[in-house]
A protein has these predicted regions:
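Bacterial N-terminal signal peptides that target proteins for export
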Residues: 3-18
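Extracytoplasmic electron-transfer domains, predominantly the class I c-type cytochrome c fold
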Residues: 138, 184, 266, 475-478, ...
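Extracytoplasmic/lumenal domain signature
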Residues: 59-73, 101-122, 147-180, 212-248, ...
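Glycine-rich (often Gly-Gly/Gly-Pro-rich) flexible segments and glycine-rich loop motifs
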Residues: 360-417, 573-580
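Periplasmic c-type cytochrome electron-transfer domains
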Residues: 44, 390, 397-411, 415, ...
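Repeat-blade elements of multi-bladed beta-propeller folds
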Residues: 38-42, 78-100, 124-147, 181-207, ...
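Mature N-terminal segment immediately following signal peptide/propeptide cleavage
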Residues: 32-77, 85-87, 583
Length: 697
């Protein structure tokens, strides 16, 4: 798959804004003239989303008003905007839905400059980027396979950085030719001393690039070191793959970002699964360093330690967020640790220097695989504490009771897809994955309060269905594309329905040739004639024969039928509420401090069904003085503030589109602001292109 949006029947969502944001007059602050930055992605190098700013308090947060709104004017149907803005010295840096980097006056929202990496020739489709890096008056950001360095004051490319065009090609230096594949970086890197350390996003079906984590010289763009997440001969972990897997295997990539302990000189990252996601006969073994938490020497890229959270992943159980650096109290002493959330709703807590588990884990026997050629891991490891923040298995007792008809529809689906174990392997009949492919935890990551030891995690409570089918090689689409897009041109997700209405034929050909997001490009593997056949199929539905099984070295015996969410007959979740939660986890005790439903469906609210929880994407920020601030909810388009001690809601505001991003907070001229990207676009929700900032009047 290369996108997460799911084209299934969903409840209708209003295409108009409930409330139009109105810019409030913001006077000069009298109490202070200080500036406080949000200097890096997620607020600090520890990725804690934490701030000591205290002008906005639990007592006055309900008085927040819109301070300014900036419209990128770049929204388009299906676009998303997941950027967490960086604020330095009164200037806000972020990205638009069309991947323009820009700078604003952080007090007024006035644009200072913008840089369009496409030169005004953006042709889509959507690509999600979650932020940028600002360091020593340079801005580093990624567009597809190009990593740019631009002047933070002018927005102009830095001459001579990388190649003569002012960018680094992320496809270079991966140990094998990947020019025809998609290699990008949806999450910004981090700077340590004079290197920019960054992970990548790559296709989740073969052909795919390896997920090397790399460090580039911030001054020149030269590659300083590289860590092979799919080990080469002689490297640790090589024997957990088939011989020569490093020459063809893909994935095991740190798509969710990296975290640096600046004092220790250590870099931490968590990886995704290996390609293919759901059938691993071509990658038999444990597959280090896929699905692993890894620590390296940030100076050299040398291995320090790892913990593999899932061996030989068959369920797309990527680690969904970068590690969070925390300090906790264990056995009466303070311990620097790494906290890692998972899609399954678990939290790993590891001693930072050694990777030692601070709470014990346990090994559990796993079901055997049923697909021909597949060999599943016989056991998997799970943390015993804290308890999971998401439900672990779907039974009849856990189905929806919204209406009798909804329950009957859900019961029919459950019985058609028997799943006696949470890790029942993918099958021809169908397997329920719960929590689903989008968690549990997701890429927004947790917020951490260093004073209380509480870790705040928003969670999706959604079941998905994976059903494998024998791969057809009778048609070009069946052999090359159905792995992600389903067996017809009207799949569950990502949808190709209506693509020809949004893109010209030339644009469709370009996407097939060059790839986009996690979709690979096929110009090298297929050639122009087959690419044109595929474009014709997308437009007309007319396919042509192929002999992929004998000509394609990456041919797989099975493919996933599609990405199906477990929904009732009206398009609502087929499981019992809550369908999304917000959780506070005590890392000192290993307990859940509180949990609440998070998000609502406006149509159900109108029917009297409130507090259901919904899909949510993006993280929270936590303040020293008692607030937890988060948008994230997909359907109600709200940003909210909660009492961090008990989850009581203190404030909410309507946004022009869903804030599927993490907010930033900062101070300019003595006034504190909260800003959120309002990009929408998730699960067929309306797309937006604005940034909204709030402040006290």
């Amino acid at each position: 798959m290369y996108v997460r949006a799911v084209s299934r029947t969903r409840p209708p969502i209003s295409r108009r804004f409930v409330v139009t944001l109105t810019v409030a007059v913001v006077g000069c602050a009298s109490q202070s003239s200080s500036n406080v930055d949000w200097p890096v992605y997620q607020g600090n190098h520890d990725h804690t989303h934490y701030t000591t700013l205290d002008q906005i308090t639990p007592a006055n947060v309900a008085q927040l008003k819109v301070a300014w709104v900036y419209d990128t004017k770049d929204a388009f149907q299906g676009s998303e905007m997941q950027s967490n803005p960086v604020i330095l010295n009164g200037v806000l840096y972020a990205m638009s839905p069309k991947q323009r980097a820009f700078a604003l006056d952080a007090a007024t929202g006035t644009e200072l400059w913008s840089f369009d990496p496409t030169g005004g020739k953006f042709t889509g489709p959507r690509i999600r980027y979650r932020g940028i890096v600002v360091h020593n008056e340079r801005v580093y950001f990624n567009h597809r396979y190009r990593l740019f360095s631009i002047d933070a004051k002018t927005g102009q490319k830095v001459p001579g950085w990388g190649n003569d065009s002012g960018w680094v090609d992320l496809r270079a230096g991966l140990g094998r030719p990947v020019d025809g594949l998609s290699v990008s970086a949806s999450t910004p890197g981090v700077v340590y001393k004079d290197v920019l350390i960054i992970g990548t996003s790559v296709p989740e079906a073969l052909p795919s690039a390896p997920g090397d984590v790399r460090a580039y010289d911030v001054n020149t763009g030269a590659l300083r070191w590289s860590f092979h997440t799919i080990p080469h001969p002689g490297e640790f972990g090589y024997d957990t793959w088939p011989p020569n897997a490093w020459t063809y295997a893909g994935g095991a990539n740190a798509w969710s970002g990296v975290t640096v302990d600046q004092g220790r000189g250590m870099v931490f990252f968590a990886t995704g699964s290996a390609s293919f996601d759901f059938y691993g006969a071509n990658r038999l073994g444990d597959n280090l360093f896929a699905n692993s938490i890894v620590a390296l020497d940030a100076n050299t890229g040398k291995y320090r330690w790892h913990l593999q959270g899932l061996k030989h992943d068959l369920w797309d159980r990527d680690f969904p967020a970068a590690p969070t650096l925390v300090t906790v109290t264990r056995d009466g002493r303070r311990v620097d640790a790494v906290a890692q959330i998972t899609k399954t709703g678990h939290v790993w807590l590891l001693e930072r220097e050694t990777g030692r588990e601070l709470f014990p884990s346990e090994w559990k026997r796993m079901p055997r695989a049923t697909l021909d050629g597949e060999v599943a891991a016989d056991s998997q490891r799970f943390p015993t504490l804290p308890p999971p923040f998401a439900r672990q298995q779907l039974t009849e007792e856990g189905l929806t009771n919204r209406t009798p008809e909804a329950r009957a529809a859900a019961l029919k689906i459950l019985r058609a897809n028997p799943t006696p174990h949470p890790f029942t392997t993918p099958s021809l009949r169908g397997t329920i994955v719960f929590p689903g492919f989008d968690g549990g935890g997701e890429w927004g990551g947790p917020a951490f309060d260093p004073e209380t030891g509480l870790l705040y995690v928003n969670s999706n409570e959604m079941a998905w269905i994976v059903r494998m089918v024998p791969r057809e090689n009778k048609s070009v689409f069946g052999a090359r594309c159905a792995e992600c897009h389903g067996a017809s041109n009207s799949p569950t997700a990502p949808s190709l329905t209506g693509v020809h209405k949004r893109l010209t034929r030339e644009q469709i050909v370009k996407v097939i040739r060059e790839g986009t997001g996690r979709m690979p490009g096929y110009k090298t593997l297929l050639g122009d004639a087959v690419i044109n056949d595929l474009a014709d199929y997308v437009i007309t539905g007319k396919d042509v024969p192929t002999s992929a099984a004998t000509t394609d070295p990456f041919f797989s015996k099975y493919r996933n039928h599609g990405y199906d969410i477990f929904l009732d007959h009206e398009g609502y979740p087929g499981i019992a509420t809550p369908w999304g939660t917000l959780n506070a986890i005590d890392l000192n005790k290993g307990t859940i401090a509180w949990t609440i439903p998070f998000g609502e469906y406006p149509k159900l609210v109108a029917q009297g069904l409130t507090n259901t929880g919904t899909d949510n994407y993006g993280g929270a920020i936590v303040t020293q003085n008692g607030l937890l601030i988060i948008a994230a909810t997909t359907y109600d388009n709200k940003i909210r503030a909660f009492d961090k001690t008990n989850g009581k809601q203190l404030w909410e505001a309507q946004l022009p589109a869903a804030g599927n991003a993490t907010p930033s907070t900062y101070m300019v001229n003595g006034k504190q602001y909260i800003v959120i990207a309002c990009g929408g676009g998730k699960n067929d929700a309306p797309s937006g292109g604005t940034y909204a900032a709030f402040a006290l009047p």
